[in-house]
């Protein structure tokens, strides 16, 4: 059994990166491996935007990540600098930056690159999408 860390750099919609990462995560968990952390970086931070509203016949990837994380104890870390540049923030950062609202999907955590470094060091495999 291997411990994995995923890095997602593509948005929830518009490219295949995030969807492929989600499917990969499901597959490795089904095979008995462990997924300790998913780090969302660059455009990948858009996976944490709770204001996405996919069509009724589309898979809701944002909420899919949260459900997967709850079921398997996975940390969903979002790069705070990349998130703020792209308009994704939690209540605390919104207040610090003087922004009118927050939109970070509950279940995701704003964090720095240090959390990615820690996850990379403690996992057996790091896979980037």
From Swiss-Prot:
Provide this UniProt record's keywords sorted from A to Z: Cytoplasm, Transferase, tRNA processing
Provide the E.C. number(s) assigned to this enzyme. Answer: 2.8.1.-
Q: Which GO biological process categories is it annotated with?
A: tRNA wobble position uridine thiolation
Q: Give the molecular function GO annotations.
A: sulfur carrier activity; sulfurtransferase activity
In terms of Pfam families, this protein maps to: DsrE
Q: Where is the active site?
A: 79 (cysteine persulfide intermediate)
The role this protein plays is: Part of a sulfur-relay system required for 2-thiolation of 5-methylaminomethyl-2-thiouridine (mnm(5)s(2)U) at tRNA wobble positions. Accepts sulfur from TusA and transfers it in turn to TusE.
> Which named protein is this?
Sulfurtransferase TusD
Q: Which species is this record about?
A: Serratia proteamaculans (strain 568)
> What broad taxonomic lineage does this protein's source fall under?
Bacteria, Pseudomonadati, Pseudomonadota, Gammaproteobacteria, Enterobacterales
List the gene name: tusD
């Amino acid at each position: 059994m291997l411990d994995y860390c995923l890095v997602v750099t593509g948005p929830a919609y518009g490219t295949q990166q995030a969807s492929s990462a989600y499917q990969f995560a499901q597959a490795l968990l089904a095979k008995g491996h462990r997924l300790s952390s998913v780090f969302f970086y660059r455009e990948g931070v858009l996976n944490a935007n709770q204001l996405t509203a996919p069509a009724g016949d589309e898979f809701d990837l944002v909420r899919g990540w949260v459900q997967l994380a709850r079921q398997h104890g996975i940390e969903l870390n979002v790069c705070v600098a990349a998130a703020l540049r792209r308009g994704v923030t939690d209540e605390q950062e919104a207040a610090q930056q003087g922004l009118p609202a927050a939109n970070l999907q509950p279940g995701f955590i704003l964090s720095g690159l240090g959390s990615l470094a820690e996850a990379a060091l403690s996992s057996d495999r790091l896979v980037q999408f």
